[in-house]
Amino acid sequence: MKILIVASDKNGRFAPFIEEQMAALEARGMEVLRYGITGKGILGYLRELPALRRAIRQHRSDIIHAHYGLSGLLANLQRRVPVVTTYHGSDINVPSILRFSKIAMRLSAHNIFVSKRNVVIALGDEAMRLLGDKAKGTENGEADIQAFTPYTLHSTPTEAFTPKNTLLPCGVNIPLPWSEVQTQWVGQLTLNQWVHSKLDKEIKYVLFAGAFDNAVKDPELAKSVIVVYNSSFTNLQSPTANRQSPIANSQSLIANRQIELIELKGYTRDQVTALMYNCHALLMTSKTEGSPQVVKEAMACGCPIVSVDVGDVAERTSGVEGCYVVPTREPKDIAEALRKALAFNGRTNGRERIIAMGLSNEQVAKRLEEIYRMLV
């Protein structure tokens, strides 16, 4: 089976989680081709249509799998090949983009949503109709969709909540244990040597779930949490306060007494894995999310997690000791959860939870193949 992946192209590659999903599909014996979109905005995407049509004729694909709503809209402007579109959150949560995503939803042969909250936003009245007499309000006014459908990650696509829509978060690669990963080489250093050159054993490190220049991730809230934590839970001066930290000159680090916040930017995938294995916690303060990959990746590394209640984080981390979801955006409340996570002082059972939910890339690729075969 030939699958043509259509997604935004960044320097000749797709987003890492798309690349990893493609590799998992190839491991199942599928021929996976790519069409990278370099245009920006709706007009930039529409200008890609002639080239995309040529690629479709050339590749003779059985299925087109588009990632994000604008890519789905573009892919559906041809009607020769069935299109599966995955909506990742930003294409649902941003109203100006949602209107284009809704057109893609109507045209696509099958839609994949990565979180239940996105389902309610995207499908609106249809979602509530499908809830039927199980619909009930929650404290924040959103629909309770725990019983939205008999579909689970262990079900077949035909059990999805409609024949055209499936709830399926993206998967993650399950890394080898740190005892095996640490011997891999990064340039002139092993990962173990690299991480010890970056992290001081005397300091507790908190990995921020994004870049400091990404306003959607709300880095200012995260920095406020660090300030509150240090003023509330420690009166000790940081060991590095009067000497230079190994990464003190980096814009990617905020140092404040006993804990330091590290920006997740500019690292390779192996380096991110090393940080997740060695940092004391992951902190997420995003304003909106779908099914954030960084949370699932941290879980796979056993990293404790503190997050505001966003996307599907609460559902993913449910039952994972050392992980805390805060129902408010108050820095003091998040700082208290961070105190608990740091006091946990160990690795979580997140890896086992990821596998139990069927969220390894291998498991998700199997579900995708079932969807593809349902359409051809």
Give residue spans per PLM region.
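Short alpha-helical donor nucleotide-sugar binding micro-motif in glycosyltransferases
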Residues: 56, 105, 274-279
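Short His-centered aromatic/hydrophobic patch
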Residues: 66-71
